Structure formats: structure tokens, C-alpha cells
Amino acid sequence: MGLTSQLIPTLVCLLACTSNFVHGHKCDITLQEIIKTLNILTARKNSCMELPVTDVFAAPENTTEKETFCRASTVLRHIYRHHTCMKSLLSGLDRNLSSMANMTCSVHEAKKSTLKDFLERLKTIMKEKYSKC
């Protein structure tokens, strides 16, 4: 019995350390997948790249990172549900951003940009985040 009481703190510590490692690793994998998808999308010469989208990056400075990811995900969802172009790539990007945001939100910004500019800005943000991960 004495050995069991000594092992409990060690096991708890190992579980905590493992969960932190896995969480950080998941962050890397998700970001890599997002950046890869954004590289593919921004390299395409497609008429859909000129579609007008809500510029969620023009939101107030006090907007959290999760809110920005959530809004970007909402914009992407609107695009691939109403247009047939690049549907699988945009839906995958939406899914990954949604998992990082882990919340629901609405988009109310009036400022617009093109899909290409939106994706380029998102790629820059994700590369910055990846460099810190």
C-alpha cells in the first residue's frame, strides 16, 4: 500500500506532462495543416479569389485571437456554402480554425476585402503563430 501512495503523485505528474506535450504537438500539426492549405489556396489563380468577403481582421484591437479565428472560420463557411469553388479546401480550413477557436461567433464588420487578401492575411497570422508555438 505504501508504494501505491508514492506512485500516485508521480503518475499525476506524468499525465499532466503528457497532456501538455500532446496539446503543444496538436497545435503544431493543426497550424502546419492550416498553413499548407493557405499556401495551396493563395497560389491558385481562380476567379473565386476576387470574391468580396468580410474583413474580420479589421476588428477592434481588443479582439482576442480566438475571436479572430472564429470570425475567420465564419467567413470561410459563408463562402464555401454559397459558392462551389475550392469547397473542400475551404471547408477543411474552416474545420481547423473552428477547432482552434472552440467557440461560436457572428460577423458584423462592414469593411470588405477580396478572398485572396483575406487568405493572405490569415496566412501571415498563422505563420506568426506557428513561429511562437
Swiss-Prot record:
One of its GO terms (biological process) is myeloid dendritic cell differentiation. Residues 1-24 form the signal peptide. Disulfide bonds join 27-133, 48-85, 70-105. GO terms for molecular function: cytokine activity; growth factor activity; interleukin-4 receptor binding. InterPro entries: 4_helix_cytokine-like_core (IPR009079), IL-4 (IPR002354), IL-4/IL-13 (IPR001325), IL-4/IL-13_CS (IPR018096). It comes from the Eukaryota. One of its GO terms (cellular component) is extracellular space. It is found in: Secreted. Glycans are attached at residue 62. The keyword Disulfide bond applies. Its main location: secreted. Keywords: B-cell activation, Cytokine, Disulfide bond, Glycoprotein, Growth factor, Secreted, Signal. Belongs to the IL-4/IL-13 family. Participates in at least several B-cell activation processes as well as of other cell types. It is a costimulator of DNA-synthesis. It induces the expression of class II MHC molecules on resting B-cells. It enhances both secretion and cell surface expression of IgE and IgG1. It also regulates the expression of the low affinity Fc receptor for IgE (CD23) on both lymphocytes and monocytes. Positively regulates IL31RA expression in macrophages. Stimulates autophagy in dendritic cells by interfering with mTORC1 signaling and through the induction of RUFY4. This is Interleukin-4. It comes from Sus scrofa (Pig).
